Amino acid sequence: MNRRNFLRTSILGTALAMSPVSFSAFGEPTRPSAGKSGRLNLSFQPYELKLRHAFNLAKNQRTTTPGVQVQIEYDGLIGYGEASMPPYLGESVQSVTEFLGKLDLSRFSDPFRIEDIHAYMDSVAPANRAAKASVDIALHDLTGKIMGQPWYKIWGLNPDNTPNTSYTISYQPDPAEMQREIDECAPFRVVKVKMGVGHDKEIVEALRRTSDVPICVDANQGWSDKEHALEMCHWLAERNCLFVGQPMPKEMIDETAWVRERSPLPIVADEFLQRLPDVQRAHGAYDAINIKLMKSTGMHEAYKMAVLAKALGMKVMLGCMTETSCAVTAAAQLSPMVDWADLDGNLLIANDRFDGIKIVDGKVTIPDRPGIGVELLG
């Protein structure tokens, strides 16, 4: 029996218990694989994602997002991963590539040792969450391919239970551009509105002139006055809003708890929430958490965060950055266990390199392919 078949038959049980756990057109990988069979070989390269529309956020505007694509090769199989780096994460192409360049995954001969590999990455550097997420995603893709199963099946999740995903719009000063964004969200059952830029009511009123579709709000830490934040929550509740994400700066936890006690809408932790210990810290100040792979260091910890939040009686939202279908489809593997999804990052870019997650009548549909479920586009 060859190594791949041996792993597929003998390690499946272990994997079920462990974590209820040239590839691009942008040029040659930075570290081309050259190792022998039976060892993990890491390669990576930077790229730039181009946004279909400018994002006008609470603190900045952006038209592109940098990223780094990752692949891990093992015994003839390739696992794909991705690091996306919006400015507030504090990571850059330089920091990610420097971190990845320090890793020596050839010391590992078993790709299922994801916990050990995370411990090794933490020993190399304590931060670098997006960089670690790219490796974690690639490992999950690889191990799922070895087992011949997508991760939602390995976790025992029902793909019929995936939620609707929201589609994101943000304020545009040009009325024609604003209307174009509103028109594009028509096929979706939920719309996420980016707020905190000084035109908060205008964007909702523009949407409500043509649609009563439920909205969720991402305030992007844009409301620093608790009275104003509470007033906005009441105003939004009258306009078919489901919840408000990160209404106040993340360090204003007492003020956020004050708003949460009085708000008619659930308050969701976003920028406040990074890693597993933050879930317990969010309990009491927030009603729900928004898990993103780039903040949680990947799928391994994201699963644990969702389980803990549910045990604490909190709701769970699954989000993403502006990413290709690689990272978004990886996140979608978790979607049957969450209450809300905001998995539209791949729909907001003009140069996706992967085929993966599909949105059918507004609902997340997970591919049945092994691993994270993506295929590299030609």
Question: Where does each model-flagged region fall?
Answer:
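N-terminal export signals
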Residues: N5-G27
